[in-house]
């Protein structure tokens, strides 16, 4: 009788294990998977709307979208080493460099041939707040320029996960 009960338990647990494994796709932690960007940007919205939009977007079966950091936006820069990740523009959430003292108009001005890996024109919001005001850091998809903006300005947004 005990053998039958143990065998029955083993079958039930095996079934549960297989069911749980197939029920939902495993997701890698954010730091171990490549960034996934939303397919199309939302246009001309203020910062609070951009934050709300990214928290509520449902795309490709995912609901864990968010507003990107300035560092994540900088990974999209092409042909402008100053604004690209690790470039001389000092603005970086990763390095805790988000004040006006970290900003240098010369090194953050972008490049004539600077462009972004995603489509779009104009300024794009980040989730990175300038730590000494209520302004947020933004990046231009026209020339990879990095600047700051008041929350009431209307800019574009790509979401990331």
Region annotations inferred by a language model:
Residues 1-4:
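Positively charged n-region of N-terminal signal peptides that target proteins for export
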Residues 7-16:
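Bacterial N-terminal signal peptides
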Residues 20-65, 156-160:
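Extracellular adhesion/carbohydrate-recognition regions
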Residues 51-62, 70-136:
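An exposed tryptophan-centered "aromatic clamp" motif
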Residues 110-113, 143-148:
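Short, P/G- and charge-enriched loop/turn segments at secondary-structure junctions
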Residues 123-125, 148-161:
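Short, structured beta-strand segments at or near domain termini in extracellular proteins/domains
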């Amino acid at each position: 009788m005990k053998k039958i009960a143990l065998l029955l338990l083993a079958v039930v647990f095996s079934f549960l294990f297989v069911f749980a494994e197939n029920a939902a796709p495993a997701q890698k932690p954010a730091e171990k998977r490549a960034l996934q960007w939303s397919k199309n940007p939302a246009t001309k919205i203020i910062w609070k709307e951009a934050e709300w939009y990214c928290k509520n977007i449902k795309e490709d079966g995912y609901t864990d979208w968010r507003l990107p950091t300035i560092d994540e936006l900088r990974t999209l820069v092409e042909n402008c080493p100053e604004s690209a990740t690790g470039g001389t523009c000092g603005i970086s959430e990763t390095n805790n460099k988000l004040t006006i003292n970290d900003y240098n108009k010369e090194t953050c001005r972008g490049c004539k041939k600077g462009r972004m890996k995603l489509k779009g024109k104009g300024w794009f919001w980040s989730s990175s707040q300038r730590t000494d005001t209520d302004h947020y850091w933004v990046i231009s998809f026209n020339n990879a320029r990095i600047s700051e903006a008041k929350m009431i300005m209307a800019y574009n947004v790509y979401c990331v996960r």
